[in-house]
Amino acid sequence: MKECAFTIVAKNYIGLAQILGQSLRQQNPSTDFRIYVADEFSEEPPTLPAEVLISKDVLSGLTVEQWTDMAFKYDLTEFCTAIKPFCFDHVFTDGYEKAYYFDPDIYIFSSIRTISEALDSHSMALTPQVVGIHSHYTGEHPEWAMNVNGIFNLGFCGIKNDDWGRRVVAWWQERLRDQAFADRSVGQFTDQKWMDWMPALLADRLCVLQSLGMNLAPWNYFERRICQDAEGTIHVTFRSDDNPQRDDRLVFVHFAGYDYSKLKQGIIERKRIENLKEYDDLALINLSYRDAIVANTAVFDAFITQPYTYGTYDNGDPITTFHRWLYHGLTLHDSPFKTGPGTFHDAIGRRGMLIREKIDNVSRRNIGNIEGKQRLLAKFYGLLYRLMGYKRYVLFLKSLYFYCRPEMHTFLINKKRS
């Protein structure tokens, strides 16, 4: 049966995706592999391997206007995930009977034959974030975050090219054209949250892959222990005794949040998930991935400095998340990347919204003196309460839920409302 695995990257991660491809071919030589590049090369690109495809040139189902709209209103992660069902459609159009998506920061340790077998009798295969029933949850990644972001992790997704698989892809395409934001206030989280619908829509046509050895990742390290047998095969078991013990072969690991440039230097360091515990048994997989990146330094370095095409206006000014969401609220149809009189760039510039300081990555984890700032905000809200009184203060807080979304602040640049 003709099968294809693929990933989606901005062009700076082509090298990381090639390392994923190497791991796939080592363990699964009969499975084809593709890399869909979400952005473009502004100049003549270096010679690209045949497996690398420029998405804008090959994907169907989106007009030029829709592509531009999505490329601007979504940030890099949102955009790469938003085109995922269109990539599935492209793979199916090329005649493949089964398609597997893997995030570029995944490394495959053994055969994916069990996934292929699952799709023999199902239309879709997904991996949950966590597979054990933990009455007393001890994971560092909070349960509420998985409730918000989705029960399944879309670092992996397998779909069969049958009637139900194609229907899911079409359904997914329609929603991700406009609803692939990471916006908790409206229950959206990229392409991933939509998969919570699959048990209801597909019922027994969905295969939930509960193997401990699939999509092993930082958010489930707390429940899974790594071990290696005398033959060198890596296995995964439950770390605690609150679930019936299992012994599953390690298939693939999702190295999400690792600092890949540091890995290239031989340094294992993670950038996401606060207070993540270091488990000694993880050294086996961490060192394997580190060694793979070190061995492919030239591959990794070939594209890593390439800028994200859709990260700036045509004059080089950076596009912030606030710009993207504000544009989305205006429902404009002209090219938002353009600069000059009468453009979106001109409108936000006149309101002082063009700054070089990087504010998108500022959070409570990296901002200085967070406790002092929280105390200052508490004093500010205390003053508001005294000025407004109980009733108006409560109603004001309710309004903040509405106005926490940048789309609701179009009045800042919309002359008719200002």
Region annotations inferred by a language model:
Residues 1-418:
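Glycosyltransferase catalytic domains, chiefly GT-A lineage
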